Amino acid sequence: MNALTVIPYAEFGIQSNFSFLRGASKPEELVVAAKLMGFSAIGLADRNTVAGVVRAWQQAKVEKLAYHPGCRLVFGDGTPDILAYPRNRAGWGHLCRMLTQANLRDETEKGATLLQRDDLLEWGDLMSLAVLPDLAAGAEDSLALLGQIKDRFGRALRLGVSPCYAGYDRFRIEQAAALAQVAGIPLMATNDVLYHTAERRPLQDVLTAIRLNTPVAEVGLELSANAERHLKPPLEMARLFRRHPQALAETLRFAEELTFSLSDLQYNYPDEPTESGLGPQAELERLAREGAARRYPSGVPHSVIKRIEEELALIERLNYARYFLTVYDIVKYARSQDILCQGRGSAANSIVCFCIGITEVGPDRIDTLFERFISEERNEPPDIDVDFEHEKRETVIQYIYEKYSSKRTALAAAVISYRGRSALREVSKAMGLSEDVRASLSGSIWGWSTSEVGEKEARAGGLDRSDPTSRHVMERANEIMGFPRHLSQHVGGFVITKDRLDEIVPIVKTAMDERKMVEWDKDDLDAVKILKVDVLALGMLTCLQRAFILLTDHYPKARDPYGQPYVLASLPPEDKRVYDMIGRADTLGVFQIESRAQMSMLPRLKPKDFYDLVIEVAIVRPGPIQGDMVHPYLRRRQGKEKPEYQKPELEAILSKTLGVPLFQEQAMKIAIVAGGFRPGEADELRRAMATFKRTGTIGNYRQRMIDGMVGKGYTKDFAERCFKQIEGFGEYGFPESHAASFALLVYASCWFKTFYPDVFCAAILNSQPMGFYQPAQLVRDARDHGVDIREVDVNCSAWDCTLEKVPFDPARILPRHADMRGVIETNHAVRLGFRQIKGLSKERMEDFAKRRGSGYETVRDVWLRSGLDVDEIERLAQADAFRSIGLDRRAALWEVRALGAKSAAEKLPLFDQPALRLRELEPETKLPKMPLGEHVIHDYRSLGLSLKAHPVAFLRERLDRAGVTPNANLPSQRDGRRVSVAGLVLVRQRPGKGNAIFLTLEDDKAVANVIFWERTFTRFRPIVMGARFVKVSGKLQSESGVIHIVAEKIEDLTPWLTVLLEKVSGAGAPGPQPMGYAKEVGSDRRSRPEIGNAPARQDLATLSEEAEQVMPKGRNFQ
C-alpha cells in the first residue's frame, strides 16, 4: 500500500469532551479531523450520554461525512462497556428510554447514570452493539456474558477491540479474535478514541487529574501510558489490524446497519382540548380576532387585520397553532394567579402574539419583521420567551409539570463550560500550584471572560511564561476554555411534547427533585427542530408587581382614566417628566439602563419617546459597540453628521435609526433588500450572528452579501462597511422586538422612580436579589430623593419593607436632584423589613410579626412570646432592631446573652419564675457606648447597609488632607482637570470585549464614574479587581452632563477602613464584648458574662481585617 491508498474504514466508539473530563476534543474537531483523514463514517459514543451528538451531526452535515449517533454504555454492575448505536428511529427511542431509566433511579445521584445489564436486556432491541470485554478477565466469564447478550440480540452483536500500545497488542488482538470466534460473533476494530490529535494528550492528562481531584504528578497509573488514543488514518488502522482485515471490514457492515439520523426526529406538539371545542387552528383564529378587538377598542386598523390574516395563514401552513395555544395557556394561567408576565424576543414581531396577550408591545410602536419569528423557508419551530415574576415563576413551572406530566415535559439543559477563571483555577490545581498562586491567577481574570488567557493575565497572576510549568498551565487553560464541565438546567426553557419525551432525548435529574431536564441545550433543540417554551424569571417584573400593589394600597388617588388601579398596560405613556429624569441619567435601580455604560449614554442620547428607549436598550451592547455603530448614531442624533443612505430602499429600513443598523431585524432587511438574500437565508444570517462565538460561521456570508450589494449598484466600500456593522452583531446583537419588550419595563420602572420613589424603593428591596446595585445603594438613592428610610425594628417591621404614612418634605431632596421637587408625589416613609437581616427565615419572621400583638416590651418578652430561638433573637439584636424597646445594639445583646435556654419552650414556667425574681434584684449594668464607627460595621455585617452613617464619612478629613475631591463636587470641576477621587467600589463593568473598564465609586455624598483604559487596567489589575476602597487619580472628562475620571493611577485604601474601629483600641471600660467579636451565631452563649469584668479584645489586625471584609466587595459585570 502507498500513502495515497484509500482504506474503507469507519471509527466507532469515539468519545468527545462530552464524556466529561475524559474526552479531550470537541465533537466538531473530531468530525473535521475524520473527514480530512478520509474515514468512510464515524460514530460518536460518549459515556452514558448523547449530549454531544447534535453538535457532531451538525458538523458532519457541513463536512458531508456519514455520521451515526450512539452511546458508550458504562454499567454499574460489572458488565463491560458496550457501544450502542440505534439502527432506526425506534431504536433511538429505546436508547433514550434505557438511559432515562438509568438516570432517574432513586439511588442515582445527579449527573450520574446507574446502568444495569437488565436495562440493556430490556431496551437493547433495534440497536447494533459492540461489547468491549476486559481481556484481562477470565475467558469463561467473557463467554458467558457474550452468550447471554447474543441469545437476546443475535446478529446485532460484535466484539470490539482496540490496541493498547503496551507492547503486546498482537497477543491482545489475537485473544479478542479467538474469543469472538468461540462466541460466534464478528470482531470489529476501534481505536477507542479520546481526542482528534496526539497533541491533546497533555490536556487529557490534566482532565484526568481534574476528574480525580489529584495533581497530575500524583495520578500515576490512572494516566494514559501513551498518546495513541487519537483518531488514526484508516491506513494506519489497517496496518495495526493487518492480521485481521475482517475487523476493519466489519466496521463498514456495522455502519450499513445504521439507518437512523437525527433528522428523523419528528417533534409532536401538545394537543390539548381547546376552550371552545374548536380545532387548534380555528381556536387560535378566534382568540386572535377577539384579542384584536380588545387591543384596538376604537376599531382594528385594516393594516392590522391584514397582518393577522397573513400570520394565521402561515401558522396554518406550518401547523404551529398548537404551539401558540400551549404558550397562551401558560400565560393565561399565570395571569389567573395575578403573576405579572410578558413575552419578549422574536415573538414581539408577531401581531398574533400581541393580540392573544403573549406580548405587550404592539406593531405600531416598532418595525416588526415576522420572518425573524417564523419563516416558511426555514420551517423551524418558533421560539417564544415569556418572562414571569422571579419569585412566582415556580408556581408556573409546577403548573406545567402537573398539566403535561413528567413523561411529556422537562427543562432544556445548559452546558456549563470552562471560562477564563474556572479554567485557570482547575488547571493550576491539577498542575500542583499552591493555593495562593491559584487564587492570584483566578483573581486576575474577569469573572465570565471567555477570552484567551495571555501574557497580561500570567503576569498579573505572578506566572513566569519562561517556566515550563507556568507555560503548561496557560496552554492547557486555553485549550480547556469552552469545554463542558457538566450539564445544568436551563434557566427556564421547557420542552413539552404530545407523546413521550424520553423517546426523543434522554431525561436526567437536576438539583431539584421535582424537576427533570433533557440532555440537549437550546441550540441542540433548535438544530433538531424541537419546540421549546422559555419560562423565564425576571426580577423587574416582581418589582413592578409589588410596586403596583403598594401603589394601589397606599395611594388611592393614583388611578387610570377609568378609575381603575394602574397596571403595566395603563401607565400614562410618554410623560415628559419621566424622560427628563432619564435624560439626566437618574436611573439607579431601574430596568436595563442602570449600568454605568448606560448612564453615560443617556445624557448624550436624551430619550424623548418610547422608540428612543428601544434604541437606548439596544445601543449599549457589545454588538453595536463592536460594529462601530454607537458614535455615528450619536453624531447624527446631535446634528453633527448627516445620515448616509445610498439608496431610498435603505432609507426605508434605517431612517428610524439615522442610517445606522442597530437591530438584527434591520440586518436581515438589508440582506434581503440590498444583498439579494431570500427571507429564509437572511434568517440564517441572523442565526450566524447569534451563534458566532460557538460556530464562527458569519464570515461564510460576507462575500455573498458584498457581491449581492455591489450587483445592485452599491459601492464595494459601502458594502464592506455595512457588513462590518452587521458582523458586530456576532457579539450579542439585539433584536428590535426584544429591545421593545424591555423598553416597556424600562419606562414602567422609571415612572415609579419619578413619581413614587418610596414605592419603588420598597418594591425593589422586596424583590432582591436583582439588578446592578446592592440594597445599600438603592436605599441611599431613595434618601437622596427625599424618601425617609427607617430602621428595622421588632415592633414596627414586617418581613417585607413597608410604607408608613408621613408628610413629604421636598427640602430633603438633594440639590443635584432639585429638578424632582414638584414632581415627586410620595408621602410615605419606607420601613426596612426583616428580610434585610442576614440569616433570618421568612416563615419564622412572619410568625414573629403575627405574635407581636400590641408590641413586645422587652427582650425577654420577645423570647417568651415570639417563638424565636435565642440565636434568632440575637440576630435581631445584632441588627440593632430593639430601639423601640429603648435598647441599642450593645444593650440588646447583653439582654439576649442573659437568656437561659435556646428557646422559651425549653424552660418550664415553674423553674423560670425564680430566675425572673432574681433578675429583678440584680444591679443595673452600665454598658459603655458603642462607637458610631463600630455601629456602622455591624450594620453592614447584619444588614448590608447602614442608615447611621456612611463608612467614608469617617475618612473625610483624611481624604481632604490627601487632596481627594468629594464626588459631589465633581460637576463644578472644569473639563480636563486632573483630580483624585475615592470611594467604595460598587460596580466593575467591562462591556463585551471593549478596551475600557468602568468603575463606580461611592463616597459619603455621591458616586464617581471611573474609566480605565486597557493599558492602565493591565498595570493596576490586582487593585482594580480586588480592592474594596480605592483612591483614583486621573483626568476629569465632562461632556453633555456625563462626568468621568479617566484613570491614570489607583491606590488601595482598604486598610483605611480600620478608622471605623479607632475607638475600640482605647476602650477599657467594663462591659460585654462588642457585638460580633464574640463567637459566631449558633455557638454556646448560655453562660452569662461576669458583671464588671472587662471583655477580652482581639488584636487590632483581626479587627482591621473584619472592618475591611464587611464592606461590600463590588459586583462585576460584562
From Swiss-Prot:
The keyword Methyltransferase does not apply. GO terms for biological process: DNA repair; DNA replication. One of its GO terms (molecular function) is DNA-directed DNA polymerase activity. GO terms for cellular component: cytoplasm. Its main location: cytoplasm. Its EC number is 2.7.7.7. Gene3D superfamilies: Metal-dependent hydrolases. The keyword Iron does not apply. It is an enzyme of class 2 (transferase). Belongs to the DNA polymerase type-C family. DnaE2 subfamily. HAMAP family: DNApol_error_prone (MF_01902). PANTHER family: DNA POLYMERASE III SUBUNIT ALPHA (PTHR32294), ERROR-PRONE DNA POLYMERASE (PTHR32294:SF4). This is Error-prone DNA polymerase. It comes from Mesorhizobium japonicum (strain LMG 29417 / CECT 9101 / MAFF 303099).
